[in-house]
Amino acid sequence: MVERELDIYWTTLIRFESQLLEPEMWDMAHKSGCRSLYYGLESANERIIKLLKKDTDIEAAKINLEQAKRVGIWSHVMCFYGFPSETEEEAEDTRRFLLENQHRIPSVEMYFFVLYKNAPVMYQADEYKIDVKVNPEHDLALDYYYTPESGQTTEDAMSRYERFYQEDFGPWALRINAREHVFLYITKFGTSDLPQLYVKNNPEAHDHNLTPEAMI
């Protein structure tokens, strides 16, 4: 794209990569038109990462986020609480990662684990030690209720998710679900204006030391 001088902007879903550590790689990504990245972190706890069958390296994730910030690429990090057998302490690892790296993370999306129909976990219930509640009357259901043998219950994860937005979410500029809209905005105005707009539209943010500098 750079060689052909296409002059286009792009965004993508991505996972944190140990192969994306060199500054030159990030310089080239921005030069090619990358303006935002949507990371599926899911969890920052090593045991849960392995259960998810991901190879996320947390230290590499920090470098990815720092390099993206340096070149002007917006990073949106997606996580959830309540993967089967996850304990309160393991969930806290994810919360701690987000809070400690808030200066590198422009926006965050937190949720709780949902057992979707046809998801790999659905077919490995014994391995993940969950009891899936399949109601024959709900044949069009897209997800199922389940109970784990250990760890947080679904209700525990939902409560923790709600507390995150009530108690921890303040330092972030926006809760972004309309990613295409944000992408279009960033391509025109850059990454720094969104936090400023948040403070402008939410004057009470200053009461919590939520300056634009703290949120980007």
Segments and roles (model prediction):
Residues 1-75, 81:
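Conserved SAM/AdoMet-binding glycine-rich loop
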Residues 4, 32, 63-75, 101-104, ...:
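A structural motif corresponding to the C-terminal end of an alpha-helix
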Residues 16-22, 97-109:
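Short, charged helix-to-loop "capping" segments that act as catalytic/coupling loops
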Residues 24-27, 84-100:
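Catalytic cores of alpha/beta
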Residues 28-29, 55-56, 94-96, 125-128:
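Short, hinge-like loop/turn segments at secondary-structure boundaries
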Residues 47, 51-52, 81-89, 101, ...:
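Flexible glycine/acidic-rich beta-alpha junction loops that bind and position SAM and/or redox cofactors
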Residues 139-216:
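Radical SAM enzyme core and accessory elements
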